[in-house]
């Protein structure tokens, strides 16, 4: 069965550009990789994807920004498939967030791989704002489409 995730691409307009907020995955596997993602997470049958995206944004950033906004504030960006096969459904939301205030939930992963040892890591270890060209070079493969769809939606 295909794993499904939902997430939110937070964006803001500056005097010269559109910027997007991305998170860097936590843990030793990602520590030295310059790979970034929209805040997202898996959802289950019966859970509306937008509800999951809002919940995951809060879990991965500590911000209630997405929970406090009305459904009509979100721009549907559709679904993409990441190279490993996970389907991600995304929404864009205009807003601001101070990356220094990021507080992420934690999870357990096996590390080192196949060691049987579990370590606790943050789901996200940091967040940052990027202009669109920089975001294109940093975001997980497959998620670039969300950036392009945001630009198209904003006209």
Predicted regions and their residues:
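N-terminal strand-loop-strand
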Residues: 1-38, 91
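Residue-level detector of intrinsically disordered, flexible termini
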Residues: 5-6, 16, 51-52, 134, ...
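Residue-level marker of positions within ordered structural domains that often coincide
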Residues: 13, 96, 152
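Generic low-complexity, intrinsically disordered sequence content enriched
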Residues: 26, 69, 106, 151-154
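Unchanged
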Residues: 41-141, 145
């Amino acid at each position: 069965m295909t794993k499904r995730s939902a997430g939110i691409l937070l964006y803001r307009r500056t005097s010269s550009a559109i910027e997007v907020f991305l998170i860097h995955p936590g843990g030793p596997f990602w520590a030295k990789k310059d790979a970034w993602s929209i805040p997202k997470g898996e959802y289950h049958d019966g859970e509306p994807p937008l509800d999951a995206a809002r919940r995951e944004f809060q879990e991965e950033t500590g911000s209630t920004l997405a929970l406090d906004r009305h459904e009509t504030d979100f721009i549907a960006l559709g679904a993409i498939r990441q190279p490993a096969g996970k389907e991600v459904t995304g929404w864009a939301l205009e807003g601001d967030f101070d990356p220094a205030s990021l507080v992420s939930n934690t999870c357990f992963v096996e590390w080192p791989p196949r060691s049987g040892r579990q370590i606790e890591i943050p789901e996200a270890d940091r967040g940052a704002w990027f202009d669109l060209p920089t975001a294109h070079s940093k975001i997980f493969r497959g998620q670039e489409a969300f950036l392009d769809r945001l630009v198209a939606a904003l006209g």
